[in-house]
């Protein structure tokens, strides 16, 4: 649609303004009928039954994707409010100093961030896991886990996995400098880990002490991952959890919508970017 005001167009064409109107655009999902709300509710419940931690925005994205619908986000919210399906609002309390920098990057493979998190099991075991996530496309493309505490050697193996996942197993180093962002955990700051990162072409950077917000993308991922997958799962022992991890990471990459990606999953977003780059 032109950005020239309609009044100006009418003056140029020498016609009366009251006789000209913008052609209204049809809704992608058709006309709005409240009689169809029971069907919308059924589709919403098909999502929330398996994704009880999803708020209305992510439910809206999943319903439209799964059922190829074109519902407005506000309609999904109204139906969920009407039938008591809305999540209780979460209160986020900020502690420590604010992070004023920008973690996200304008393109993929400019900055990767990594972190370690723990999953306590009912048996008393604690599973340690580490991951690598791209600071642009949000894909978790490498991870490792063990029922023992992770070491610097595990992180160096994780670096190899990240390199091969993005650039192929024949690559000995990344084709261009990529920042490797982590906290100050001993696995990451060990001299051997720092030197190995440089060998691979990575540029290791760490967050300031007592400032986890500076690795906020990794922190946010851990919070989301635990809420959406770990909480309420079968956590009998480390072996049971380890058997589920691959499926959880795969679902996160292929299905979970991200607001930063226009409510697309990281796989959908990367596929679109690949199509765009190949068409140029």
Residue ranges and their predicted role:
Residues 1-280:
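Charged DNA-binding/catalytic regions of mobile-element recombinases
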């Amino acid at each position: 649609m032109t950005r020239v005001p309609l009044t100006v167009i009418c003056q140029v064409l020498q016609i009366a303004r009251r006789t000209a109107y913008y052609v209204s655009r049809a809704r992608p999902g058709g006309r709005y009928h409240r009689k169809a709300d029971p069907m919308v509710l059924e589709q919403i419940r098909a999502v929330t039954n398996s994704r009880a931690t999803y708020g209305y925005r992510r439910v809206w994205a999943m319903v439209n994707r799964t059922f190829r619908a074109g519902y407005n986000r506000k309609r999904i919210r109204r139906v969920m409010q009407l039938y008591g399906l809305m999540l209780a609002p979460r209160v986020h309390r900020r502690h420590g100093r604010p992070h004023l920098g920008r973690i996200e990057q304008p393109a993929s493979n400019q900055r990767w961030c990594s972190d370690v998190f723990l999953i306590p099991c009912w048996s008393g075991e604690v599973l340690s896991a580490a991951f690598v996530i791209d600071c642009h496309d949000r894909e978790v493309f490498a991870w490792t886990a063990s029922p023992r505490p992770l070491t610097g050697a595990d992180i160096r193996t994780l670096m190899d996995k990240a390199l091969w996942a993005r650039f192929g197993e024949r690559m000995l180093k990344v084709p261009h400098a990529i920042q490797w962002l982590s906290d100050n955990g001993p696995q990451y700051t060990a001299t051997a880990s720092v030197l190995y990162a440089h060998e691979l072409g990575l540029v290791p950077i760490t967050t300031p002490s007592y400032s986890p917000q500076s690795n906020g993308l990794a922190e946010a991922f851990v919070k989301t991952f635990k809420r959406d997958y770990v909480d309420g799962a079968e956590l009998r022992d480390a072996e049971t959890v380890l058997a589920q991890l691959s499926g959880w990471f795969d679902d996160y990459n292929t299905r979970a919508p991200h607001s930063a990606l226009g409510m697309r999953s990281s796989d959908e977003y990367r596929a679109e970017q690949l199509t765009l780059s190949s068409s140029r």
